[in-house]
């Protein structure tokens, strides 16, 4: 569980404890309790969903997108997006509201409603960290990619002794996010060391804070955070082997030997 989630759960329990007291609360106390719960809901349900750092038409054609996955309109006036450099910051103006299930895209340059208005790229193509911070200075969401993600993405386990006969399609490699950031794995790949099998993570593959994903040898019905090589034959030799995780710039991130 991430520190942010743990904080939110603890604060929600405090409010619920107050509301469950036998003594009748004043209207002011009730209003304050609801306000606190609303603030916690917003803190939990606003996310950075994507960061386009490559620039398709030009190096300035970058953007970062946030999303309200809750059913309450969020006032994000005074919140800011912090890029990797301290002077790269976008502050949301007064009267900025994020409706339920709405996206807001913040461009690097140009005259769109939300833009850094920068004449140079904001997001480093080799790797960077984007952070959404509320008006109290609390981190709401963080998104990391490239070399900035290297310390946080590890191959944590290889289940090389499958139970399925012959194909051993239930064997898998597990990748874990050790950080409080959302890690972008788009176009990263997982390579087997003893054969030429390779799995490439599709665009928009993300690993939430302190969670894991599994890449199976051959699994048809996939759940959240599950992927498959779709190999009809076994990949992982019971006598020994290994694999490595490579990022989108062909740099090794993690390896695992058994």
Segments (PLM) and residue ranges:
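Short amphipathic alpha-helical heptad-repeat segments
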Residues: 5-12
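Charged, low-complexity interaction regions
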Residues: 20-27
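A structural motif detector for short, solvent-exposed N-terminal "entry" segments of globular domains
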Residues: 34-79, 120-126, 135-189, 233-239, ...
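Beta-strand signatures of extracellular beta-sandwich domains
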Residues: 80-82, 131, 189-191, 244
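Intrinsically disordered, low-complexity Pro/Gly/Ser/Thr-rich segments with frequent PxxP/GP/PP motifs
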Residues: 87-118, 196-229
